[in-house]
Amino acid sequence: METIFAQSSAFGKAGVAVFRISGPKSLEVLQLLTGRKDFKSRLMYYQQITVPETKELIDNVMVVYFKSPGSFTGEDVVEIHTHGSKAISIMLTNALLNIAGIRLAEAGEFTKRAFLNNKFDLTAAEGIADLINAETIMQHKQAIRQASGKLEALYNNWRSQLLKMLSLLEAYIDFPDEDIPDTVLNEVTNTHTILVNTISEYLNDNRKGELLRSGLKLAIIGPPNVGKSSLLNFLMQRDIAIVSNIAGTTRDIIEGHLDIGGYPIILQDTAGIREESSDIIEQEGIKRAINSAKTADIKIIMFDAEKLDSSINEDIINLIDENTITIINKIDLIEASKIFSIENKYKCLRVSVKNNIALSSILKNIENIAENMAGFTETPYITNQRHRNYLQQALSHLTAFSLDNDLVLATEDIRMTARCIGAITGVINVEEILGEIFKNFCIGK
């Protein structure tokens, strides 16, 4: 196995920059850079590092050596903590590249080596990636749970039950002359029923984990000049959309990213929707606005208090569902009695974006819907489309299983189900079945 290195921290000015080295030559490389031979594992040392060929000083650093297998990758690992300087990073990188037998790591290669050395399964590796990319508290909670092995435990439990079923079926087929009780098939049937129901229910999760991981799309919809761009700017706390009294100013979809109550929200300001427009570009913007609303997870539909009749057109009303927040904007410009019927009919919030009236209620409603759609629970969710694909395949094989069919074919359905679950965690080894057979039965008794 080659020895690899990379700067683990971001390149640029910082208090500290961290370099990681992993592989059989890690300790030798550290000795070359420092001129010191005696390094104990898991102790931090204050050292000077120099260019091995010229002995030019690179930096005064802190270094630590992790002896295999007690490291992140399971290999010998060295970490070098330098000052966070671009010049130091370049000098150390060049010095390492000039040492024989060491190369720059590929993206994700340290984590890949950790997986190959059985430090964790594929779901935990994906959890680490999600943890690095997490931008909100709820994303962090989901990622840390996955990285700590909660998903692995769930899938391994299902796979263990499948292997038990498989061992019982294999024994029933391969050892017909042995004294195997008929209750074996009853146990298989009961486990099969439980797993079908459990996995079916697990898949029927409204993609909560995936929504939390990728972010919930929120589209702001309404007629022209109703205040959509002003609302977007308020939510983003900065001007990212042009605000104008001229109808049709927003022609395309404008996006912004927001953290509301710990949930990642992808805001989309859209072109104003009106029934007639002679402008070809605006027509395309309206078409995109409607499509954006149809694919959005959450919608804010805005009505103009001064122009309620023109605000409420069929295209907009048809977009309302249980995840829609309807608001009447510009309430400061009209008497409350004039909007009462519409307010009640569509359960609208009464706000004034311009004068910052009742805008906190919009944030609270967004948070409530986000929590309902992607709220964190103790049961681990599916967080990745890869997992969902394999689980759907597993359920398909599991559903096809029937003891009324050929027993060999039925056994193959269970085998394929176990392989699909194993593919999620990265553990696929049908030889485990043999161990299950001898563990559960005394063959030749």
Curated annotation (Swiss-Prot):
Q: What is its main location?
A: cytoplasm
Gene Ontology annotations for the cellular component aspect, listed alphabetically: cytoplasm
Among the GO molecular function terms of this UniProt record, one is:
GTP binding
Task: Report the SUPFAM superfamilies cross-referenced here.
Answer: P-loop containing nucleoside triphosphate hydrolases, TrmE connector domain
Keyword Ribosomal protein among UniProt keywords = no
Single biological process term from Gene Ontology: tRNA wobble uridine modification
Positions contributing to K(+) binding: 225, 244, 246, 249
Q: Where in the cell is it found?
A: Cytoplasm
N-terminal signal peptide: none
Q: Which Gene3D superfamilies match?
A: P-loop containing nucleotide triphosphate hydrolases, Probable tRNA modification gtpase trme, domain 1, tRNA modification GTPase MnmE domain 2
Domain of life of the source: Bacteria
UniProt enzyme class? hydrolase
Q: Which InterPro entries match?
A: G_TrmE (IPR031168), GTP-bd (IPR006073), GTP-bd_TrmE_N (IPR018948), GTPase_MnmE (IPR004520), MnmE_dom2 (IPR027368), MnmE_helical (IPR025867), P-loop_NTPase (IPR027417), Small_GTP-bd (IPR005225)
Q: Supply the alphabetized keyword list.
A: Cytoplasm, GTP-binding, Hydrolase, Magnesium, Metal-binding, Nucleotide-binding, Potassium, tRNA processing
Query: Could you say which cofactors this protein requires?
Result: K(+)
* Protein purpose: Exhibits a very high intrinsic GTPase hydrolysis rate. Involved in the addition of a carboxymethylaminomethyl (cmnm) group at the wobble position (U34) of certain tRNAs, forming tRNA-cmnm(5)s(2)U34.
Its recorded name reads tRNA modification GTPase MnmE
